[in-house]
């Protein structure tokens, strides 16, 4: 029995076979990524992942003013860090703020996410820093399943349902994707939002609304937030807006007017400002403590 649906996978108002095949692919992808999630049995063999858990643990203890928080890990070298939730003045002071991770190889948002979920988990049970892998790794797995879905959407957009499903299936079974999903690192999140950014670029070209540029900026900021080395993604942003100028005049260069360029330039500026804002919110001390960041 088919269910009535207005979903993009529907055909004539009925859920098509494509939906069910994609659902199977996503379920298989999730199962592969969650299998063996406790692969290191708590020994934290991955150094970057270990740093994220331990720094987020120390930050959580400092924010909650736990006894001995200033003697926790990296905080021993930060005697000016003030315990408790920061006020506005403390928040913008790189030395006193408890939210400054003093560590920038990877995006600060990864640490903040762990602190946020730690505060929720602690409402129900005590948990140590390394046991937060039971939260971090499933989040990474879910992000990579989102990547599988985005691969389908892009493949479908470019070449049709068959290619979209084939690409999603290969991505679901890709060893490197499955491996990265077993670490709480930036790769799975950055890939997801990078693909989502490409989808948003396409959407912006089709709909040409200011809202679509805002969505594009948001997704670009989320792509860069976990890993600053993704900054080159801004190059396609420039190209896609220039393509939009040409598309508006159907490729006739002589019809390009200053007013048209200014209007589309304003859309591009909005996307850039939102992307920069998202990055600042997710990693404020990359700017406030820029000497340590660079």
Mark where each language-model region is.
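Transmembrane-helix motifs of polytopic, lipid-linked glycan transferases
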Residues: 134-158, 196, 200
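Short helix- or helix-capping micro-motifs
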Residues: 29, 167-172, 199, 220, ...
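Short acidic/glycine- and proline-prone juxtamembrane loop motifs at membrane-interface regions
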Residues: 47, 176-189
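Transmembrane-helix signature of polytopic, membrane-embedded enzymes
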Residues: 20, 25, 124-130, 151-173, ...
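Start-transfer (signal-anchor) and selected internal transmembrane alpha helices
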Residues: 1-33, 146-149, 156, 165-166, ...
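Transmembrane-embedded, aromatic-rich helix segments that form part
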Residues: 191-192, 214-216, 229-247
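Membrane-interface transmembrane helices that cradle and orient dolichyl/undecaprenyl
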Residues: 158, 162, 197-213, 223, ...
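Transmembrane-lumen/periplasm boundary regions of multi-pass, lipid-linked membrane glycan transferases
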Residues: 32-35, 52-88, 103-114, 122-125, ...
């Amino acid at each position: 029995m088919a269910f009535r649906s207005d979903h993009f996978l529907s055909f004539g108002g009925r859920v098509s076979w494509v939906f069910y095949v994609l659902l199977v692919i996503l379920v298989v992808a999730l199962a592969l990524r969650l299998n063996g999630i406790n692969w290191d049995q708590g020994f934290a063999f991955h150094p970057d992942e270990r740093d994220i858990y331990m720094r987020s643990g120390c930050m959580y203890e400092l924010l909650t003013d736990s006894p001995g928080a200033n003697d926790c890990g990296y905080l021993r070298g930060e005697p000016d860090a003030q315990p408790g939730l920061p006020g506005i003045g403390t928040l913008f002071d790189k030395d006193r703020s408890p939210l400054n991770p003093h560590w920038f190889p990877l995006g600060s948002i990864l640490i903040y996410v762990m602190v946020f979920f730690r505060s929720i988990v602690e409402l129900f049970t005590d948990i140590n820093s390394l046991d937060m892998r039971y939260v971090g790794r499933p989040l990474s797995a879910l992000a990579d399943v989102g990547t599988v879905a985005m691969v389908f959407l892009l493949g479908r957009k470019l070449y049709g349902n068959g290619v979209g499903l084939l690409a999603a299936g290969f991505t679901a079974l890709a060893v490197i994707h499955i491996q990265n999903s077993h670490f709480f690192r930036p790769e799975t999140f950055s890939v997801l939002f990078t693909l989502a950014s490409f989808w948003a670029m396409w959407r912006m070209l089709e709909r040409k609304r200011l809202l679509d540029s805002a969505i594009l900026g948001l997704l670009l900021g989320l792509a860069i937030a976990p890993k600053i080395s993704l900054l080159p993604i801004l190059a396609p942003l420039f190209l896609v807006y220039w393509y939009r100028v040409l598309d508006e005049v159907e490729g006739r260069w002589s019809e390009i007017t200053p007013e048209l360029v200014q209007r589309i330039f304003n859309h591009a500026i909005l996307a850039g400002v939102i992307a920069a804002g998202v990055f600042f919110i997710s990693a404020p001390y990359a700017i406030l403590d820029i000497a340590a960041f660079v």
